Amino acid sequence: MRLSIVLPTYNERGNIEPLLSQLLPLQEQFDLEILVVDDDSADGTAEHVRQLAQRHPCLRLIRRVGRSGLASAIKEGLLDATGDLALVMDSDGQHEPAGVLRAVQTLQQGDFDLVVGSRFHQEAEIRGLSGRREQGSTWANGAARFSLHRRYAGLTDYMSGFFALRLEPVLPLLRAVDVNGFKFLYELLAVSHGRLRVAEVPLTFQPRLSGTSKLDLAIF
């Protein structure tokens, strides 16, 4: 089974190598592809990834010059992915890499198109999420629940940046996602109009490995 992991980056040079060191052992279980989608970072993230890719053939760099934005980076990475399954996660270390296997196994073993890692699942752990950001996420999730198809009413984290999906059935929807919209996962659910079979798994959300969050002033 081929698994593509999409990592959008912007100035994550201090975080990307520690994260990759935890993801690369997945090669023992999957035909692994890791796509780092970099928005022309000023801190040398792309150059560092390019050097790492010389030692790890499963690693690919997509360097975006003149294009920017988290949602568009996710979309570009997913459309370029070659796996049967794909997983999107943050590149700053706040998403626990151990959750990758949990999400992918749930996707494989269940009859699902999409598996969401939820920060607000009853078994989730949140460490390092600012009070402002947690409050904003709670508000945004409440609003999202009322705006999406009722089939998704049982989900707890529509704003999650951690999710796994089956590429082939979801590909037409990915192409239709508005990258200028709210959040990528939310927009994907919106364009699906209730057609996706979705499950959630608990997510451990932890402090950044290095640097400061770019989202503390946002509602994510």
Model-derived features: positions:
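Cell-envelope/extracellular polymer assembly enzymes that use nucleotide-activated donors
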Residues: R2-S4, E33, E187
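Catalytic donor-sugar/metal-binding loop of nucleotide-sugar-dependent glycosyltransferases
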Residues: A153, V177-N180, L189-Q206
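A conserved acidic beta->alpha catalytic loop
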Residues: D38-E47, G93
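Acceptor/aglycone-binding surface of glycosyltransferases and processive sugar-polymer synthases
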Residues: I62-D80, L85, P97-F182, R208-F220
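Short, well-formed alpha-helical segments that are part of the catalytic scaffolds
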Residues: E12-Q27
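Short beta-strand/loop segment that forms part of the nucleotide-sugar
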Residues: F30-S41, I62-R64
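Acidic helix N-cap motif at the loop->helix transition within catalytic regions
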Residues: G14-P18, D43-L52
